[in-house]
């Protein structure tokens, strides 16, 4: 959803990074949680909860998201799971990197798995 009065985007789980956090992260803005590796936790959440992101070119979707955010004049992002984002210039590149990060090689459709020795597959 989008609140036109506050220019606030509510992306649901689109910017989520699971329930992992350290003491003190709750109640902070994303930019204040300097010990939280946003790229990594976003990548893990996307891989595990939004599995389809591991089998498609996420650049297409992230490009469209960024264009939409610019068209709407988004100033704040309030994800369902995750910290509010108020400094888009600082945080959105980390979000982009997390959403397009390569997933766990065992879970993606990249290279086929190597058969176990003695098993021709």
PLM segments and residue spans:
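C-terminal regulatory/interaction regions
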Residues: 64, 86-121
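Metallo-beta-lactamase
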Residues: 2-79, 84-87
